[in-house]
């Protein structure tokens, strides 16, 4: 007799969600986690004494509030902070910054007053444009997805089909130029919006297919509402842990899995690196597909065409995170001085234009550190003082396009170079910034690969691109969370709908298990 009804591998937010849903439905559940903490690539860690930093994800960018209700997370202590603005995206002094107010009326007033009626019309236009895609997302979100090509073909009219084709297969700028056509007047808005199109991808804003990532980021969650959990991003996972434990499940920390135990094509449990074997009726993996199938299952247990499909998944996702402690907040000057008067400076993003992003992309894809990196600079303790000692502050810079295939001997040198360049981008507009830094640590995709076991350090668990989304995620034929191995299921970001903190792949993976369990 198996020791558990279900074992979930990985205590990130998706793995924990799957475990909790199963436990709530009466199954005995064990979640095994490699590290000594929960959260995966959405954890809050004390990197420096007294300071808490969000390692990996830093806000709920594509989260839907309904998941809080489905998992009853407020009951287990989750409290969300809703900032006045999600970000302030800026460029050169002659460019008007874009402030991502979370209040609809406030952002409309800002666009009309500071950017002109054309910008306000443009925002309304792109919102209506993306609604066509969002209708598909909403219909397919909590189920095994259909083929996107089939959904496009079944669109009610030619105009909708054209919109969907451009969204899925066009570039981000193909979409944005329709609504913000002035390359000079609208370049800061264009740059800010198309920055989402390079997140979780291996593309630039003019690359065909980047429109899909743009649509993904602005339709999957609650747009313009970058909420953050009080206590750090890891507080979300901690609330799910409490829910899991309240329903009889538990997490076993410091328990990396060596291999899956398989008998006659059916999984029977897991073997930990310690040698301990744990049996279960079903196993769910929240890890990426390559780690799951090539690392834990083994090629010899799988059909050759399936192995080929897994090997074909792309994971090239280069980035750095710079976590810092500050003795004072930066004082922005000139055209950004207004940001010092409120918590608008919670996230300051230097993204002058889509052409600027494209230059970074060109250097990155040729293995070079961008001369002037894209830089998101967040000051989380401005919104949540519990993250830092009184009188001090936390700061994190996230920057895309750190070279992907860096020789081991050059990694530290190049990551240091890119970190300094990213800091310079902010210090250029806040002269006291560099002098305010007390401590810092630079993390790249290499750190996330070694610490969390995710292929290539790719936080998307498989890039956002047309050939790796919808019914092709994680691979064609297995978008229903099943696998070629009996009673082995997937439940992580490698599955539909995809990456980001959503809890939806975990929820859907658990539902697939329950559907079979009840038969």
Specify the residue positions occupied by each region the protein language model found.
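Structural core of flavin- and non-heme-iron oxidoreductases
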Residues: 1-37, 41-42, 111-112, 118, ...
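Extreme N-terminal leader/targeting segments of oxidoreductases
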Residues: 1-6, 24-25, 469-471, 476, ...
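A glycine-rich dinucleotide-binding beta-alpha-beta segment and adjacent secondary-structure elements
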Residues: 186-203, 367-380, 432-496
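A conserved FAD-binding loop/helix module that cradles the flavin
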Residues: 493-514
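N-terminal glycine-rich phosphate/pyrophosphate-binding loop and immediately adjacent elements
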Residues: 2-139
């Amino acid at each position: 007799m198996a020791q558990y009804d279900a074992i979930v591998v990985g205590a990130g937010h998706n793995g924990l969600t799957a475990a909790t849903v199963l436990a709530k439905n009466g199954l005995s559940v064990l979640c095994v986690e490699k590290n000594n903490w929960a959260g995966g690539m959405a954890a809050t860690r004390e990197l420096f004494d007294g300071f808490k930093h969000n390692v990996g994800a830093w806000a709920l960018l594509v989260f839907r509030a309904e998941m809080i209700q489905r998992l009853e997370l407020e009951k287990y202590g989750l409290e969300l902070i809703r900032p006045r603005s999600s970000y302030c995206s800026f460029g050169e002094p002659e460019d008007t910054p874009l402030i991502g107010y979370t209040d609809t009326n406030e952002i409309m007033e800002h666009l009309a007053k500071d950017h002109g009626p054309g910008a306000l019309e443009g925002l309304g236009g792109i919102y209506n444009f993306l609604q066509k895609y969002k209708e598909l997302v909403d219909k397919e979100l909590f189920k095994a997805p259909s083929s996107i090509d089939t959904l496009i073909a079944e669109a009610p009219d030619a105009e909708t089909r054209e919109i969907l084709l451009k969204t899925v297969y066009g570039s981000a700028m193909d979409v944005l130029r329709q609504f913000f056509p002035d390359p000079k007047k609208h370049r800061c808005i264009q740059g800010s919006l198309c920055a989402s199109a390079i997140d979780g991808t291996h593309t630039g804003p003019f690359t065909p297919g980047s429109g899909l990532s743009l649509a993904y980021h602005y339709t999957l969650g609650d747009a313009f509402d970058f909420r953050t959990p009080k206590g750090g991003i890891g507080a979300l996972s901690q609330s799910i842990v409490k829910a899991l434990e309240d329903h009889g499940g538990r997490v076993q920390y410091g328990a990396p899995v060596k291999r899956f135990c398989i008998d006659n094509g059916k999984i029977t449990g897991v073997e930990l690196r310690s040698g301990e074997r744990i049996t279960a009726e079903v196993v769910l993996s929240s890890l990426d597909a390559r780690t799951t199938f090539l690392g834990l299952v083994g090629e010899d247990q799988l059909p050759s065409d399936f192995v080929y499909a897994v090997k074909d998944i792309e994971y090239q996702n280069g980035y750095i995170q710079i976590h810092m402690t500050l003795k004072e907040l930066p004082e922005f000057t000139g055209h950004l001085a207004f940001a010092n008067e409120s918590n608008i400076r919670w996230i300051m993003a230097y993204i002058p234009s889509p052409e600027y992003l494209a230059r970074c992309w060109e250097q990155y894809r040729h293995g070079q550190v961008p001369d002037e990196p894209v830089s998101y600079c967040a000051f989380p303790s401005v919104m949540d003082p519990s993250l830092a000692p009184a009188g001090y502050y936390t700061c994190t810079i996230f920057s895309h396009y750190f070279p992907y295939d860096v020789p081991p001997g050059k990694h530290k040198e190049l990551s240091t170079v890119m970190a300094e360049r990213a800091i310079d981008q902010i210090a250029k507009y806040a002269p006291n910034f560099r002098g305010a830094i007390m401590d810092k640590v630079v993390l790249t995709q290499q750190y996330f690969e070694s610490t969390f076991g995710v292929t290539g350090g790719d936080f998307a668990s498989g890039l956002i691109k047309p050939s790796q989304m919808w019914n092709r995620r994680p691979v064609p034929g297995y978008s229903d969370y099943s696998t070629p191995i009996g009673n082995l299921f997937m439940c992580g970001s490698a599955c539909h709908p995809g990456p980001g903190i959503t809890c939806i792949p975990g929820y859907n993976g658990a539902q697939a298990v329950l559907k079979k369990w009840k038969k």
